[in-house]
Amino acid sequence: MATMNRCPSWNGYCKPDRAMPGLNEWNGRSMRPSFLWGRASTYSSPDLLESRKHMTTVAERVRQSLRAIPDYPKPGILFQDITPVLGDGQLLAEVVREMVRPFGDRKVTHVLGIEARGFILGGAAAMVLGAGFVPARKPGKLPWERATEAYDLEYGSDSLEAHRDSWPRGSRVLVVDDVLATGGTARAAGQLARGLGAEVVGWSFLLEIDGLGGRSRLEGGQCHVLARG
């Protein structure tokens, strides 16, 4: 679920760039399901063009499926409910495929999903990439030794936490969340990952809220967004 605040009090997103090699075996050697991938092998130029056309179609279906709820959870906020997207199995599979496509050849070892809807999309993305999944949680939710990264909100501050043993040093991490707005939360997630010795390969989001400048706050990795609104 994504919230669009008419006053920028948001956090979180990026740019489709490279197509992903198809990975279409689900067997003892590979855990990438064929129904998520489509064609195998690296994309040639015509294939890349077709892939981008398909991503545009998926983005349009996402925008059509989002349920806009005005004045929720408080007056002045237009809440973008993503549960219709999650509830459509075919669309969800296509969404996850398109969210990870630019990172298929980037040797991602772990996906860092931002609480809470980043857990849903990030877990699915990790499965498709054959990577581990790590939750970036709000304070006080993790039971083991934690690393913490604080970030500013419009009124106050918040923080994200992850276990200190989330991955070995030198791991390659993709940050996933549902929405990119002002970019504060996503930036903090990237800093949290780097503080734990990882290289941030990039960020991937389902939806970007236009006009809030979130992507300008994300440094040192590719930023990919499926739909804009």
Which residues does each predicted region cover?
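Short, glycine/charge-rich flexible loops or terminal/linker lids adjacent to PRPP-binding catalytic cores
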Residues: 131-174
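Active-site-facing substrate-recognition patch
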Residues: 52-108
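Short amphipathic, helix-prone segments within low-complexity/disordered or flexible regions
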Residues: 2, 8-10, 16-21, 25, ...
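PRPP-dependent phosphoribosyltransferase catalytic core
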Residues: 54-58, 64, 187-229
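Short, Lys/Arg-enriched N-terminal segments with co-localized hydrophobic residues
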Residues: 42-54
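Short glycine-rich phosphate-binding loop at a beta-alpha junction
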Residues: 108-115
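Short Gly/Thr/Asp-enriched flexible loops that form oxyanion-binding sites at enzyme active sites
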Residues: 120-129, 189
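Conserved G/P- and acidic residue-centered "switch" motifs that form tight phosphate/ATP-binding loops
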Residues: 178, 183
